[in-house]
Amino acid sequence: MSIKSDKWIRRMAEQQGMIAPFAPELVRHNGTGKIVSYGTSSYGYDVRCANEFKIFTNINSTIVDPKDFDARNFVDFVGDVCIIPPNSFALARTVEYFRIPRNVLTVCLGKSTYARCGIIVNVTPLEPEWEGHVTLEFSNTTPLPAKIYANEGIAQMLFFEADEVCETSYKDRGGKYLGQTGVTLPKI
């Protein structure tokens, strides 16, 4: 299994629709100033966070249960900046929609710019033949409020091509998050 380069990522995005919308180069400015970078890097693709957020709240005194998740655990927020409370958690989604080829495993990692501020993005795989917007999970590990910027870089995707095609893909087994759009809550 080998990691794929910027040339491969560009080709797959432009010819196969693997990433849409797609930035063929790393973007560091938005016309008004510096931003957290997004787009194609040497061996990965830095994704942007959309402006839809779900922020954890305890106002309803519910219990967090992955088998029986209560949507009242979150407050919905739309905006260019999301403030995550101290020692709390938020969900968002990528701007980009992904279509992962059958012979590729993609891994989502956090960007060091955010990690150095105590904001951690969950490491998660995008399995062969999965497609959709990626739901992103952010933990604010600090005792202070923390900012997440919409439409700027938030995480990096690494693409690994397998030596052989998998026998059963995410699509084949009817994966529960296949084709997700928007911020998707846990499912069983």
Curated annotation (Swiss-Prot):
Entry GO MF terms: dCTP deaminase activity; nucleotide binding
Pathways per UniProt: Pyrimidine metabolism; dUMP biosynthesis; dUMP from dCTP (dUTP route): step 1/2
Entry annotated with the keyword rRNA-binding: no
Binding site for dCTP: 111-116, 135-137, 156, 170, 180
Keyword ATP-binding among record annotations: no
One Pfam family matching this protein: DCD
Listed name of the protein: dCTP deaminase
Originating species: Aromatoleum aromaticum (strain DSM 19018 / LMG 30748 / EbN1) (Azoarcus sp. (strain EbN1))
Gene name tied to this protein: dcd
